[in-house]
Amino acid sequence: SHAYSQNSYDIIISNGRIIDGSGNPWYEADIAINGEHIVRIGDLSLDTANQFIDAEGLTVSPGFIDPHTHALRGIFDVPNVESSLLQGVTTLTEGNDGTSPFPVDEHFQAILDKQISPNWGIFVGHGTIRSQVIGKEDRDPTPGELEQMKDMVQQAMQHGALGLSTGLFYVPGSFASTEEVIELSKVAAKHGGIYISHMREEAAQLIDSVNETIHIGEESGIPVQMTHHKVIGVKNWGSSVESLRLVDEARARGVDITIDQYPYTASQTSINALIPQWAQEGGRGRMLERIESPEIRATIKREVVLKILYDRGGGDPKNIFI
């Protein structure tokens, strides 16, 4: 038999349960680290290290990826992002729900200059691009405007965007046709991107929205992530049985679609989600003009009340936390 040659490492993490992210079952092993790299996994009980970490009773895994954040609002103020790192999250993605920085290359440079701690990825937001080309108008783009939007998606992808995000529930994404989204998704797909969507509706029209999301993936040939899948409104609870069946059927016929969800029975968004989309058409100035009209304000108020009772408001104003 050969004598064991003792090795020395910077760090050895021992006695932990390893979950490696591959989908395989956990297993017990030691991990050796030199510099910033894992160099060996196995029984390292005879080896030495400058630092030993005993992971007895703990799980050792790669850093978690948070696929849906709005960390952009605070990343430059708190670049270490301890709230994520202390939970094991080492990669954050932004640009979700159709809103993103643009141009993307300028944003990445700002991130590098700030030296933020986690890994960072950006989706290019459909709503951001639409706003820059069309504004908050409720209409289709002209052929020239659509080409301009496609060029902007291509530019973002060439500068490192992960794909295209939409927030079809929010203005101005809500004013976009399915075909518009398909055309832009085709551009992202050419560059290896994915499509991630806050769908058009997650309440009474949930099933229509799931079908639309699947259709976008099929027509544009792009992998699809159906983000924070949920069923809003008590009367709609149970619809997830149908929505999940649709996703399973789409996957069975070859559509690359996945979903994520958050593990609590609440949602959070901006308060303008309670304001009807037609009232937001044309931008903030136009919305304020409508609110100044007593008749229109009364109509808006009625719709806000309905949304609180049957949609985003959780059924009762007591369930809203501002």
Identify the function of each model-found stretch.
Residues 4-12, 18-63:
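Histidine-rich, glycine-flanked metal-binding segment
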Residues 123-124, 128, 132-143, 147-170, ...:
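Active-site neighborhoods of metal-dependent hydrolases
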